[in-house]
Amino acid sequence: MRSWLLLLVGLSSYFALSTSVNRAKNSGSDFDLESRASTTNVNSILSKRKLRAPGGDTNTLKDSGKARREKKVWKLFCRVFLQLDDEKKCMFETNQVSSHQPEPRPALSFMPGPKPAHSLVPESKPVRSLMTGNAPVRSIATKLKLVLPRITETVKNPSKSQVVMLWLHKVAEFSRSEHGVNTMSYRTLYEWLSPSFSDAKLAKFFVGLREDEALRETAEKMLAYMLIKSTSTEAVGRAWLKSGEHPSRLFESMNFKEADFKDTVFLGWLKYASLYEKHYFSQSELTDYRRQLFFYRMYDYIKPMYSYEKTQGFLEYKFEGLTSIPGMQDFGQNLADIARRERKISFYLDSEFTPEALFNYLKVSDENLLTNVFQWLRYCRRYTMAYKYVPFDELEFLEEKLGEISLWIYQVYGKL
């Protein structure tokens, strides 16, 4: 009878223990299993559940009948407890139900739209400590030079790397500062990134960054540098041409203050204009007119950067210098020819040529139509501005001289 009673008490303890474990497990309790499992012991569990070992201590149990019964129950409890895994032990130890669920950590998003560097929290502690401080970008880059390649060597897309994106936001902030305008080197920026990413990946990456207002200027200047760099020209050209960006729009967004032919960024823009011209203008008679229009537009963007005195022959000389750059021989020569024609327009105005007289002098109606018709039309525009009292209708005059093609030429010229 006594043995059956002991067995019943033992089973009751076991089922009570299992019920507590299952209840705790199903409640979704959140525990630090590793730390709790290392400190779990029977006495601590008993004290939390307001239980006690027989006689207060298993080592000092008295050898009485009641003590022997309690000791058997205690041993059965300990045997069942020790067979549980660590998770169930921890649940049984705490016996606490928590309804609090930790809020999910929001995913970091870098594009599109600008995000200040200090609002982004990378996982890397060294990077976080650098980015949240006020250290100059150059010193940050020196320290990140050890971090960047190691972290990004397995990242196929730079935009997926928190370190790269956060760092570039910091670089962009620095480049807009008074000190950064004079010291920012895109060659150095390229050298920092190129060990981790190929030119093709960098080109595609920076073309995409132009959609981010905070990084647009940095991206465009970086692309301009890579365009003029012989080893990366082809990769950047393909990526930029794929975007279909017209050079005139890039010129406006880059906000050039002066046409410095020694400036890598300005030369990079000219290089892209050359690639654009070769890519979008096929060899045909009608397309040749649009190509001439394209070169006049490039000239009109550059000319206002110089004073009147310098434009007299100065731009012609500078454009001829572009012919020494590989891949820009024809582009530079076409711009030099236009600069030469524009210089002659000033001479024709000083000589008081009438539009009719200049049309015959340039032999526009002969085989020189493509070369000279836009020069003549530009002269007519300046002539009517200088001599407003002399009415002249260039379209009517062209129809009389050239016939049907005159209307198409005038429509193309109207886009200039």
UniProtKB/Swiss-Prot annotation:
The compartments listed are: Secreted; Host cytoplasm; Host nucleus
The yes or no answer to whether the keyword Signal is present is yes
Q: Which GO terms describe its cellular component?
A: extracellular region; host cell cytoplasm; host cell nucleus
Span(s) of short sequence motif RxLR-dEER: 49-88
Induction comment from the UniProt entry of this chain: Expression is up-regulated at the earlier infection stages.
Question: Which function does this protein serve?
Answer: Effector that partially suppresses the tobacco programmed cell death induced by cell death-inducing proteins.
Query: Record's family?
Result: Belongs to the RxLR effector family.
Q: What is the protein name for this chain?
A: Secreted RxLR effector protein 25
Q: Which organism is it from?
A: Plasmopara viticola
